[in-house]
Every structure is written in structure tokens, then in C-alpha cells.
Regions:
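Double-stranded RNA-binding/processing signature
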Residues: 1-77
Length: 77
């Protein structure tokens, strides 16, 4: 799967199994300006399920839903 597919898959998962709101939020930045690392979390109904890091907000925003889906599939939440 491409990274973009994880966002779509998570959206479909939430629509099918949850009735709540899916939210992505940047929760941290670290590193120097030329090598910044962004950390993003994914929450469903206000409950945080996964985190993702990346050199850009977009990269972190692609890694976070992947980690969330892995957690949800592992725990069958």
C-alpha cells in the first residue's frame, strides 16, 4: 500500500466501525530548522490511537494513520 492509501483505509475503517470523528493533530516538533521532525497523532472520538513522525507534516500525516491501522487491526478495536 502507498502511504496515501493508509489515510483512505483509516477513513473507511472509522466510517464502518465507529460513528465518531477522525482527527489528525500535530503534537510536536523537534530538531533544528533544517532537519525538523514533526509528530502527529490520530484520534477517534477524542481517543488517541496512533502516532507518526516525519520530516514534513505531510509525511507525519501519512505515518500516523498507518500506525493507527496496525494498532486497530492487532487489537481488533
Amino acid at each position: 500500500l502507498s502511504a496515501k492509501d493508509y489515510k483512505t483505509l483509516l477513513q473507511e475503517y472509522v466510517q464502518h466501525y465507529h460513528s465518531g470523528e477522525l482527527e489528525y493533530k500535530v503534537i510536536g516538533m523537534s530538531g533544528p530548522d533544517h532537519k525538523r521532525v514533526f509528530t502527529m497523532c490520530v484520534s477517534i472520538d477524542g481517543v488517541v490511537y496512533g502516532f507518526g513522525d516525519g520530516g514534513t507534516k505531510q509525511e507525519a500525516g501519512q505515518n500516523a494513520p498507518q500506525a493507527t491501522l496496525e494498532l486497530l487491526n492487532r487489537d481488533n478495536v
